[in-house]
Amino acid sequence: CWPFLLGFLIFITYFLVILGSGTNICIILTDRRLHTPMYLLICNLAVVDIMFTSSTSTTMISVLLGEVKTISYYSCISSMYIYHLGDITGCLALSLMALDRTIAISNPLRYHSILTNAQIFVLIIASWFIGIICLGIALAWADFDNLPYCQPIIRYVFCDYPALIRAACVNPEPYFLIPTILALWLLAGQFPLIILSYVKIIYTLLRLPNSESRAQGFNTCICHIIVVSCYYAPKLVSVLLTRIGVRLNLTERNALLIIATLLPSLINPTIYCLKTKEIRKRLVQILSRRKRTVSIKCQKG
């Protein structure tokens, strides 16, 4: 019974992620007033969320709810590639959003001259390029096509780098060297920058004389802090448990993987739809217009 319940829960979560992130993308792309650096970054994060969640949720739903409990080797490799690419670009996207908010709050008068849409496009493309390069290095180091596999079974809920390495009949430690260095560079490099950015933002907001501007700034800042916390918290918990010597069993590890994969992608569109005034206002306009259209058609009928 529990596989069906878990699969159904993942299906509902995946549906909400697609609905929320897709709504954000459509609203931002169709409203020229939202073609600003902040909203372009939100749109980029929504694309990452859809890609990141789709790479794992579709496999989990198929295995838990479907009759076929297998996945082809190349489908597994593709799923792993998309999953880790989404993870890396998501990390870099949060850094770009922290940079954007730091400039917007610390230098509001020069914001549009410091950050233009063209510069944001370049930064977004660069973040994807970095993700592709980092992932290419890790995959070249592992050389999955030439690994000897003991059995065609992955004891994880989806395909990722550790799962495929541990399924092979090799000592896994050397294969984690380069990916660990890359992960430390990303997490240890980006996370402190994000923390320092928000410390600077909070310091700037506390110095504002206008309470209304201060409240508006904190409102925006809290949205981003929640998103960052949901992204990094499961990863930090996993690292801390490993450092203090707590060994997770397979069920606990899979549960942490599911939370780390689905929670950020579910929270992000909810936060930006409910807390971002312009997106919320545009969404209300679309819904009220659709309701009015349906009402007119009913009256004519």
Which residues does each predicted region cover?
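Transmembrane helical core of 7TM receptor-like proteins
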Residues: 1-301
